[in-house]
Amino acid sequence: MRIIGGSFKGIKIFEAFDKNTRPLRDLVKESILNILEYSKDSKINFNNSLILDLFSGTGSFGLECISRGAAKVYFFENYNQSIEILNKNIKKLKCENKARVFNQNAFNFFENKELKNKKLDLIFLDPPYKEENIKVILENIAKLKLLKENGLIVLHRHKKTKDDFGKNYTINRSARYGISKIIFLKKIN
Protein backbone atom coordinates (compact mmCIF):
# COMPACT_ATOMS: atom_id res chain seq x y z
CA MET A 1 0.00 0.00 0.00
CA ARG A 2 1.25 3.47 -0.85
CA ILE A 3 0.28 7.12 -0.72
CA ILE A 4 -1.14 8.00 -4.13
CA GLY A 5 -0.84 11.79 -4.28
CA GLY A 6 0.31 14.96 -2.59
CA SER A 7 3.50 15.63 -0.66
CA PHE A 8 3.88 11.97 0.45
CA LYS A 9 3.18 10.56 -3.02
CA GLY A 10 4.79 7.17 -3.62
CA ILE A 11 5.71 6.48 0.01
CA LYS A 12 4.79 2.96 1.08
CA ILE A 13 2.82 2.70 4.28
CA PHE A 14 2.29 -0.22 6.61
CA GLU A 15 -0.88 -2.28 6.29
CA ALA A 16 -2.62 -4.98 8.28
CA PHE A 17 -2.69 -8.57 7.10
CA ASP A 18 -5.40 -10.24 9.13
CA LYS A 19 -9.04 -11.24 8.93
CA ASN A 20 -10.22 -8.33 11.10
CA THR A 21 -9.36 -5.61 8.60
CA ARG A 22 -10.44 -4.75 5.08
CA PRO A 23 -7.99 -2.26 3.59
CA LEU A 24 -9.32 0.37 1.23
CA ARG A 25 -8.07 -0.72 -2.18
CA ASP A 26 -5.85 1.77 -4.03
CA LEU A 27 -8.22 1.86 -7.02
CA VAL A 28 -11.20 2.78 -4.84
CA LYS A 29 -9.20 5.27 -2.78
CA GLU A 30 -7.81 6.95 -5.90
CA SER A 31 -11.30 7.18 -7.43
CA ILE A 32 -12.70 8.82 -4.29
CA LEU A 33 -9.84 11.30 -4.10
CA ASN A 34 -10.09 12.18 -7.80
CA ILE A 35 -13.79 12.92 -7.36
CA LEU A 36 -13.09 15.03 -4.27
CA GLU A 37 -10.34 16.99 -6.00
CA TYR A 38 -11.68 17.43 -9.53
CA SER A 39 -15.46 17.06 -9.75
CA LYS A 40 -17.72 20.09 -9.85
CA ASP A 41 -20.43 18.73 -7.55
CA SER A 42 -18.33 16.92 -4.94
CA LYS A 43 -15.18 19.02 -4.73
CA ILE A 44 -13.24 19.53 -1.50
CA ASN A 45 -10.33 21.92 -1.04
CA PHE A 46 -7.92 19.84 1.01
CA ASN A 47 -5.70 22.80 1.94
CA ASN A 48 -6.20 23.53 5.65
CA SER A 49 -9.23 21.24 5.78
CA LEU A 50 -10.50 19.38 8.84
CA ILE A 51 -11.34 15.73 8.26
CA LEU A 52 -12.96 13.00 10.34
CA ASP A 53 -11.98 9.43 9.44
CA LEU A 54 -14.33 6.96 11.17
CA PHE A 55 -13.48 3.25 11.17
CA SER A 56 -10.06 4.43 10.00
CA GLY A 57 -8.20 1.12 10.14
CA THR A 58 -4.53 1.75 9.34
CA GLY A 59 -5.37 5.27 8.16
CA SER A 60 -4.66 5.16 4.44
CA PHE A 61 -7.52 7.51 3.51
CA GLY A 62 -6.85 10.10 6.20
CA LEU A 63 -3.12 10.02 5.47
CA GLU A 64 -3.91 10.72 1.80
CA CYS A 65 -5.83 13.79 2.97
CA ILE A 66 -2.87 15.00 5.03
CA SER A 67 -0.59 14.41 2.04
CA ARG A 68 -2.89 16.68 0.01
CA GLY A 69 -2.83 19.52 2.56
CA ALA A 70 -5.37 18.77 5.31
CA ALA A 71 -4.70 20.76 8.47
CA LYS A 72 -5.93 17.96 10.76
CA VAL A 73 -7.39 14.49 10.48
CA TYR A 74 -9.21 12.92 13.42
CA PHE A 75 -8.87 9.13 13.22
CA PHE A 76 -11.30 6.86 15.12
CA GLU A 77 -10.48 3.16 15.36
CA ASN A 78 -10.93 0.61 18.13
CA TYR A 79 -8.97 -2.37 16.81
CA ASN A 80 -5.60 -2.26 18.60
CA GLN A 81 -3.52 -3.79 15.81
CA SER A 82 -4.86 -1.23 13.32
CA ILE A 83 -4.15 1.62 15.75
CA GLU A 84 -0.59 0.39 16.20
CA ILE A 85 -0.06 0.35 12.42
CA LEU A 86 -1.80 3.73 12.01
CA ASN A 87 0.56 5.28 14.57
CA LYS A 88 3.56 3.73 12.77
CA ASN A 89 2.33 5.25 9.50
CA ILE A 90 1.89 8.68 11.08
CA LYS A 91 5.39 8.49 12.52
CA LYS A 92 6.86 7.30 9.20
CA LEU A 93 5.27 10.26 7.38
CA LYS A 94 6.26 12.66 10.19
CA CYS A 95 2.78 14.16 10.32
CA GLU A 96 2.08 13.83 14.05
CA ASN A 97 1.00 17.48 14.27
CA LYS A 98 -1.73 16.90 11.68
CA ALA A 99 -3.10 13.59 12.97
CA ARG A 100 -5.11 12.84 16.08
CA VAL A 101 -5.79 9.15 16.80
CA PHE A 102 -8.56 8.02 19.14
CA ASN A 103 -8.80 4.44 20.36
CA GLN A 104 -12.56 4.65 20.40
CA ASN A 105 -15.50 2.93 18.77
CA ALA A 106 -16.60 5.02 15.79
CA PHE A 107 -20.23 4.75 16.91
CA ASN A 108 -19.29 6.74 20.02
CA PHE A 109 -17.29 9.48 18.26
CA PHE A 110 -19.88 12.09 19.28
CA GLU A 111 -18.84 11.65 22.94
CA ASN A 112 -15.37 12.96 22.13
CA LYS A 113 -14.97 16.48 23.49
CA GLU A 114 -12.20 17.35 21.04
CA LEU A 115 -14.73 17.43 18.20
CA LYS A 116 -17.06 19.80 20.02
CA ASN A 117 -17.69 22.96 17.97
CA LYS A 118 -15.54 21.72 15.07
CA LYS A 119 -16.71 22.37 11.52
CA LEU A 120 -15.47 19.61 9.25
CA ASP A 121 -14.90 19.72 5.51
CA LEU A 122 -15.07 15.96 5.01
CA ILE A 123 -16.18 12.90 6.97
CA PHE A 124 -15.08 9.51 5.68
CA LEU A 125 -16.97 6.40 6.88
CA ASP A 126 -15.49 3.00 6.08
CA PRO A 127 -17.35 0.60 8.40
CA PRO A 128 -17.00 -3.19 8.29
CA TYR A 129 -19.09 -4.56 5.42
CA LYS A 130 -21.36 -6.41 7.85
CA GLU A 131 -22.22 -3.14 9.64
CA GLU A 132 -25.51 -1.77 8.37
CA ASN A 133 -26.58 0.75 11.01
CA ILE A 134 -24.78 3.86 9.81
CA LYS A 135 -27.91 5.96 10.26
CA VAL A 136 -27.05 6.44 13.97
CA ILE A 137 -23.69 7.99 13.08
CA LEU A 138 -25.26 10.22 10.44
CA GLU A 139 -27.89 11.42 12.91
CA ASN A 140 -25.17 12.33 15.43
CA ILE A 141 -23.20 14.21 12.76
CA ALA A 142 -26.33 16.23 11.98
CA LYS A 143 -27.19 16.77 15.65
CA LEU A 144 -23.70 18.12 16.39
CA LYS A 145 -23.68 20.20 13.18
CA LEU A 146 -20.19 18.92 12.40
CA LEU A 147 -20.21 19.52 8.64
CA LYS A 148 -19.36 22.87 7.12
CA GLU A 149 -21.90 24.40 4.74
CA ASN A 150 -20.48 22.59 1.70
CA GLY A 151 -18.99 19.67 3.60
CA LEU A 152 -19.29 16.11 2.38
CA ILE A 153 -19.66 12.65 3.84
CA VAL A 154 -18.11 9.80 1.87
CA LEU A 155 -19.35 6.33 2.72
CA HIS A 156 -17.60 3.12 1.59
CA ARG A 157 -19.89 0.07 1.86
CA HIS A 158 -20.66 -3.33 0.43
CA LYS A 159 -22.75 -2.96 -2.72
CA LYS A 160 -25.59 -5.05 -1.24
CA THR A 161 -25.94 -3.02 1.95
CA LYS A 162 -29.32 -1.35 2.27
CA ASP A 163 -29.11 2.42 2.39
CA ASP A 164 -30.93 4.47 5.00
CA PHE A 165 -29.34 7.86 5.54
CA GLY A 166 -32.17 9.47 7.46
CA LYS A 167 -33.77 12.82 6.70
CA ASN A 168 -30.69 15.06 6.97
CA TYR A 169 -28.75 14.01 3.86
CA THR A 170 -29.10 13.64 0.15
CA ILE A 171 -27.02 11.49 -2.18
CA ASN A 172 -24.76 13.78 -4.17
CA ARG A 173 -23.03 11.05 -6.16
CA SER A 174 -22.43 7.29 -6.02
CA ALA A 175 -20.24 4.73 -7.76
CA ARG A 176 -19.55 0.99 -7.66
CA TYR A 177 -16.18 -0.75 -7.70
CA GLY A 178 -16.39 -4.54 -7.60
CA ILE A 179 -18.17 -5.44 -4.37
CA SER A 180 -17.84 -1.89 -3.02
CA LYS A 181 -20.04 1.11 -3.41
CA ILE A 182 -19.07 4.67 -2.64
CA ILE A 183 -21.73 7.20 -1.69
CA PHE A 184 -21.16 10.94 -1.42
CA LEU A 185 -23.66 12.63 0.89
CA LYS A 186 -24.44 16.31 1.38
CA LYS A 187 -26.50 17.70 4.19
CA ILE A 188 -29.91 19.09 3.40
CA ASN A 189 -30.02 22.75 4.40
Regions found by a protein language model. Name each.
Residues M1-N189:
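Class I S-adenosyl-L-methionine-dependent methyltransferase catalytic core
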